Amino acid sequence: MNIRFFCLIKEDIRYWSYLYHIDKCKFFHLFIRFPEFRCLLKMRLKCGEQANSSFFLKILRILVAISCRYHNCFIYTEPNVIGKGLLLHHAFATMISAAKIGDFCHIYQQVTIGNGGGGIPIIGNNVTIYAGAKVFGNITIGDDVVIGANAVVTKDIPSHSMVAGVPAKIIKKRFCFKEAWKKYEDNI
C-alpha cells in the first residue's frame, strides 16, 4: 500500500476544507460540491492504482471517472510529482503537463502548462497561476510566484516574483520574510 498516496489525499482534503470552511464530512462535501476536487482526486488515484486494488478504491475510481467526464481538466503530469494541497479553481479547459508541481499551488481556469521547445516546466511551492496564463518549455518557476491572467511565460522566473504580460515580465518582487530573517541572522 502506498502511504504517500493516502497522505497526499489527506493533505488535499485538509487544505481544501480549510480554504472553503468545511467542518463536517469533508471528503464527501468536497467530492459532491467541487468538480475540480474530483479532477484532482482522479489524478491522485492514478498514483494509487499500483498501490492498492481494494474494493473501495475501485468503486471510487469508477465514480470519479464518471463525474470527471465532462469537466475538460487534463492533468498529464505523473501523480507522484505533484505536491500536496494543489488547488484547481474553476479548472475547466485546463491542461497541465509539468515535470514537477510544488506544494500548495493554485491554478485557475484555462491555464496551459506544457511542452515548448524541448521540455516541460518545473513549478515551485506556493505558486498562483491566474486564468488563461500559459507556461511553456524547459523552465523553472520559483517559490511564491504569482503569474498574472493571460501571461505567457517562456523563461525562468525567480522566487518571490509577480509576472504579467505577453511575454511575461517581472512587474514586482514580493517580500519574503524567510529570506529577510535569514539575512538578519547572518549579519548578527
PLM feature segments, named:
Residues 1-71, 180-188:
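Terminal amphipathic alpha-helical/low-complexity segments used for targeting or macromolecular assembly
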Residues 69-164, 168-171:
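Structural signal for interior beta-strand "rungs" in well-ordered beta-sheet cores
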Residues 165, 169, 176-181:
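Eukaryotic, compositionally biased intrinsically disordered regions
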